[in-house]
């Protein structure tokens, strides 16, 4: 986990925001400490998902800075931020086995199978997915698929934070 700071963060989906109503997020100054667990609460449409997408890099803020510790990551691509995001609806490769779904982020980063296998088995055990490791993900329940989404974030040792956007 990393210290996450949001400095005067503002975001608009309007190309040239002029009115107050043009802003999805207005002047957010927040700091989340290393190792903490935090929740964003609010009604639908208030900007929770937008804020998470700004932190993960899926969106770039219209104004302000996103910092991890003292490092400004505002302009970094999502892959360079070492953030895992678990979305409301599970993102799972149905044609792959549970094992291959969990191994995907590690293989994508070029880790040798000798390092992939023990890490996948460790995370599968933690999430109680071991009995299904060699089954196709398509056969799992919604909560089993969400465990895979979570597992793909946990399997990487370089992840600084895991962001949950209304997980089941």
Regions found by a protein language model. Give the residues of each.
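The feature captures the beta-strand-to-loop junction immediately N-terminal to the Walker
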Residues: 41-43
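Conserved ABC ATPase signature
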Residues: 75, 136-146
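Short coil-to-helix segment of the ABC ATPase nucleotide-binding domain corresponding to the Q-loop/switch region
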Residues: 96-105, 136
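Helix-to-loop junction immediately C-terminal to a conserved catalytic motif
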Residues: 56
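ABC ATPase C-loop
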Residues: 133, 154-155
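Conserved ABC ATPase "signature" region
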Residues: 72, 107, 114-132, 163
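Conserved ABC transporter NBD signature motif
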Residues: 64-72
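ABC ATPase NBD coupling module
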Residues: 60, 72-87, 108, 113-114
